[in-house]
Amino acid sequence: ELVIPQGKGTITLDVGEFEAFPLPDYAAKYVIDGYKSYFVEVEPGIKVHVLEVGSGFPVFLLHGNPTSGFLYRKVVEQLPTDRLRLIMPTLVGLGFSSKIPASRHTLENHMRWMNSVLVQLKLTELVYMGQDWGGPIGMGALSLSPELLKGAVLLNTGFNAPTEKADVSRVHAAVKTPIVGELMIEVFTSVFERLHRVQGDPDSIPTDVAELYGRPVLESGNSKAPLAMMRMVPDGPDHPSTAAMRIIEKYVQALDIPAEIVWGMKDPI
């Protein structure tokens, strides 16, 4: 089912007005002064929640599954907000963005929706930072507006389309099975309750941070995104995501830009 979040009032950016979204207290405590919180409606009823802070050269930071734009909150604290405009959207289905039926979670849809954010913010150039699903979705969105990308910081992610049958992890293999996946991720326990277990440092996701990511999803009544996005991960040449991954791979291979790869060596996935 489609769950449409509701904001309050408007927020004015240089490129126009957007629907403001005052953060609830449990989320507001994680952001520094000067943050903007607003929605970009990428198609009727589908709103992408955006956190933004700073002014200057745009940096587009995209998270993965099952977190949100808040993933980059500590990164932002280390960056010069007087010289950088830091834009942190949340993927549709997660955080405070709209929730959608599981069937609408496709790589092509997420690419198109995130590209719409770039277009509506009227960005003309940017540096991109991506992690997990934010890697291919972000690069896929940029492949639709290839003139924008001037540099990239790549975290734990990947852009290669699979050429043979293989699963990313044992968990990804298990959740592909209908009903089994639902029982594992949605019924027996919430994916957010286990989030600390798939970190190199489990202490990096204490209970309050798990709540930051999980509460807006669970309270929405539609928590289909985490499982749907796990099933989006291509496991072979015939997977529904593979065609889009081939486009993304080709785009990334042709890039000639400054890039930095920062990889968490204890990432268990």
Residue ranges, per PLM feature:
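Short hydrophobic segments within beta-strands
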Residues: V3, V53, L61-N65, M129, ...
